[in-house]
Every structure is written in C-alpha cells, then in structure tokens.
C-alpha cells in the first residue's frame, strides 16, 4: 500500500516530487551517473533500485509498471535489456552515492549517484571457488586411477620390503664393528 513520504517534499508538492524522481531516474539510467544535491540523491536511491528490481524480473507486467513511472521508452528498453540482466545475480545495492564538494553558488551539499558496475565480492568469491573446484577435478580424476593402482602396489609392496630389510640389517651389523674400532683406538 502506498504511503506518503515523511518530511518535506522535494520541489514543494507531491506531484512535483514524483516528476522530479522520474526525471532523475531517467537521467541515471541513461547516463549511468548523475550529479545532484544530496537530499535528491538519497530520495532517488530507493526509487531507482525498485525500478531495477522490476527490470531484473523482466516480465511484461514489470515493464508496464516501470513505464508508469518512466515515460521514455528508450530508457526503459535499456533498463530491461542491459541494466536488469547485469544485476541479475546481485540482491540490492545497485547504486552508490558519493559526496562531492558543495555547489559554488549556494553551498548546497552535492553528491554523485551512480550505478555500481563492479562485480560483487561474493561473485568473485564464487568465481574463485569454481576455479579451485575445476583445478581439483583433474587432480581427482588423476587420483582415481592411482587409487585403483594402490591396491596392486600394496600386494607388491611386501616383496620390495624384504630386500629393504636386508640393507637395514647390513647397516646394523657394521655398527658394532665401528664401535669396536672406536674402542681400540682409545
């Protein structure tokens, strides 16, 4: 259910605020970033993010809901064909507000609001996880034949152990001789 926004309206009346937000959103989707006053940017952020969420869904009903607010069909086309699919794997946080220096004429606080074009940390972590898994897949495939060979190696292992025991016994036998040589030298 639509509820009126609290506080003073941007531009004076509610109809002017609706038109103002629609025009700001149109400019944002057309250019990717806009410079405006900080209160306008803060009011635009949830408005634009809801429109992007509609664009992610992509249904005809969602397109008509967006067309109620944004009258430029070219911008709506860009929103649904480029911006919406770009944010398909992102849950919110489509815009960023960066404070900039105040406006020179009236010292109004200014901000830049822009669409976030970088990949998310989680998507990069997912990519790293997939790369790691793909590297493990060949290792696992190589380990599977080795696992099949290991039982044969275990059966063949007692035969080599017997010759290895002989050199150990030979190494153990000269030690008393070495001790005997050492004691005779004293």
Curated annotation (Swiss-Prot):
Gene3D superfamilies: Ribosomal protein L17 (3.90.1030.10). It holds the Pfam family Ribosomal_L17. It comes from the Bacteria. GO terms for cellular component: cytosolic large ribosomal subunit. Residues 139-177 have a biased composition (Low complexity). InterPro entries: Ribosomal_bL17, Ribosomal_bL17_CS, Ribosomal_bL17_sf. The keyword Ribonucleoprotein applies. Keywords: Ribonucleoprotein, Ribosomal protein. Signal peptide: none annotated. Residues 123-186 are annotated as: Disordered. GO terms for biological process: translation. GO terms for molecular function: structural constituent of ribosome. Part of the 50S ribosomal subunit. Contacts protein L32. Belongs to the bacterial ribosomal protein bL17 family. This is Large ribosomal subunit protein bL17. It comes from Mycobacterium avium (strain 104). The lineage of its organism: Bacteria, Bacillati, Actinomycetota, Actinomycetes, Mycobacteriales.
């Amino acid at each position: 259910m639509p509820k009126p926004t609290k506080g003073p309206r941007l531009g004076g009346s509610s109809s002017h605020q609706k038109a103002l937000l629609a025009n700001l959103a149109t400019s944002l989707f057309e250019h990717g970033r806009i410079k405006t006053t900080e209160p306008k940017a803060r009011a635009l952020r949830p408005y634009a993010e809801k429109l992007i969420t509609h664009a992610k869904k992509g249904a005809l009903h969602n397109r008509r809901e967006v067309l109620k607010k944004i009258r430029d069909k070219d911008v709506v086309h860009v929103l649904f064909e480029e911006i919406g699919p770009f944010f398909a794997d992102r849950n919110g946080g489509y815009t960023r507000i960066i404070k900039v220096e105040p406006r020179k004429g009236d010292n109004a606080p200014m901000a830049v609001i822009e669409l976030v074009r970088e990949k998310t940390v989680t998507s990069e972590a997912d990519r790293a996880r997939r790369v790691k898994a793909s590297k493990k897949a060949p290792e696992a495939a190589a380990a599977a034949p080795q696992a099949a060979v290991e039982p044969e190696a275990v059966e063949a292992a007692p035969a080599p152990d017997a010759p290895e025991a002989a050199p150990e016994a030979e190494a153990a036998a000269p030690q008393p001789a070495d001790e005997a040589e050492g004691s005779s030298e004293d």
